[in-house]
């Protein structure tokens, strides 16, 4: 059994080694920094600014997050450096998301941010400051088996974030640490409260990071030109108008404004598909409508965490959403960048642009983008 990189069995570092911690101002990264500090490592904090915003923006929490990060760094007794990656974030994450939205897909910016910003730009910056590793407050584990690194699920199945880390490579895992991967979220909050952290009860961040709590439609309108169009049934019957298909995702119920039709039952309507060429939103009625379910998908942009990819066909588990239970499937290789995934049971609301992530037991193998 290899070395698992979390608090109950940290890597065999020299205690005078410098470990940088990505301090977000949240409770998870704060406790991660505390754990490392109390194990005798020299810890430095790094706060990322990934989005340029007006300080008066009521929806942006960056100013408060930085204030919290400074307070925690002072409380623990570590230095804190502020680094601005807004240009890199725009080029490698946000622009990609805009392109995907414009094509009617639903991207996952957290996945790209982890690969391109946190575990690339931030890791590189940490190295320049003399750190040997970058630590974050992610709920996941890293295992070293004969210098091959495996990404494992967190001990807290409800908070596991391996789904969002599936694009990391061997170098990134070898130079990263997840100090709270062995904890339950409740334990992390209890530690923070016991130590008097001001953020011990701070709400977890949710949604798309650069949008914050503002309305998704209002934000996207600032960057993309919306084209209103028809809402149709699969049979082609026009039953309403949409504001722009980029605002909707498969499985969505809210915001359609087509309920209470005299020619339909009382069951709610759900988005089942988006016809980008015709600019048409296709909807069906009822949560269990058969067209909302599919037993297969194809994916592209394949990435395998280990240097040697698995043999195909591969029977394993998969997730098409981060909080979904593992689903049994068979993966068949189509070419170097595409594969076919056949599920044992039909899956609801498979969404183009989202990630499908593969698992064998607790190990995250990698994944791809649903096509």
Swiss-Prot record:
This is tRNA-specific 2-thiouridylase MnmA. Transmembrane segments: none annotated. Residues 108-110 are annotated as: Interaction with target base in tRNA. It catalyses: S-sulfanyl-L-cysteinyl-[protein] + uridine(34) in tRNA + AH2 + ATP = 2-thiouridine(34) in tRNA + L-cysteinyl-[protein] + A + AMP + diphosphate + H(+). Catalyzes the 2-thiolation of uridine at the wobble position (U34) of tRNA, leading to the formation of s(2)U34. Belongs to the MnmA/TRMU family. Disulfide bonds join 113-209. It comes from the Bacteria. ATP binds at residues 22-29, 48, 137. GO terms for biological process: tRNA wobble position uridine thiolation. InterPro entries: MnmA-like (IPR004506), MnmA-like_C (IPR046885), MnmA-like_central (IPR046884), MnmA-like_central_sf (IPR023382), Rossmann-like_a/b/a_fold (IPR014729). Keywords: ATP-binding, Cytoplasm, Disulfide bond, Nucleotide-binding, RNA-binding, Transferase, tRNA processing, tRNA-binding. It comes from Coxiella burnetii (strain CbuK_Q154) (Coxiella burnetii (strain Q154)).
